[in-house]
Amino acid sequence: MGPRNPSPDHLSESESEEEENISYLNESSGEEWDSSEEEDSMVPNLSPLESLAWQVKCLLKYSTTWKPLNPNSWLYHAKLLDPSTPVHILREIGLRLSHCSHCVPKLEPIPEWPPLASCGVPPFQKPLTSPSRLSRDHATLNGALQFATKQLSRTLSRATPIPEYLKQIPNSCVSGCCCGWLTKTVKETTRTEPINTTYSYTDFQKAVNKLLTASL
């Protein structure tokens, strides 16, 4: 499930800013994550709940290489759209990293209960009342997912909208664009001042750590 490295071959090396973006992507690519997770390439035989926690734990290791997002760096946002990146995998298990959605052409709604079916984990409903370990695990998982969903929803509500014509650009074109035209277009149509969001990786790590403490 290792991420594919971006292909910057078509980028103009005469523009220092694009070179800087390429270097930025290479430094934070999934290659580092692949090497660190080499020994954990196979998922252990765990219960659905423990399996989810195991996946989140692996992705949390990768998150230590994440850097602050630059709203003007479209190349990084395009990298986030690549379905092979750990960020996309994390979205698939319900913790959607949509804090960069202010310049992503098409936004996806965040449901009240994030979908978990894509990774083989059944959706959890209300926390169980039994004092068993399983019920405590369910309650903690629910809390972590609800926390992440609430934070991401707040971020989306504060996201800077982009012009309507940018919404017409297919995601496939965005993720495969290496000519620099889309980068230039987005830079000209998005705000340059810092965007205030409520989502933080520290908060996310606290929520996930609570999950792992209870279930592993």
From Swiss-Prot:
Compartments, as annotated in UniProt: Nucleus
Comp. bias regions, Acidic residues: 29-41
Region (Disordered): 1-42
Alphabetical list of InterPro entries matching this protein: DCAF16 (IPR028216)
Main localization of the protein described in the UniProt heading: nucleus
Top-level division of the source organism's lineage: Eukaryota
Record-linked PANTHER family: DDB1- AND CUL4-ASSOCIATED FACTOR 16 (PTHR16194:SF0)
Subunit structure and binding partners: Interacts with DDB1 and CUL4A.
The name this protein goes by in its record: DDB1- and CUL4-associated factor 16
Taxonomic source organism: Homo sapiens (Human)
Phylogenetic lineage: Eukaryota, Metazoa, Chordata, Craniata, Vertebrata
Gene encoding the protein: DCAF16
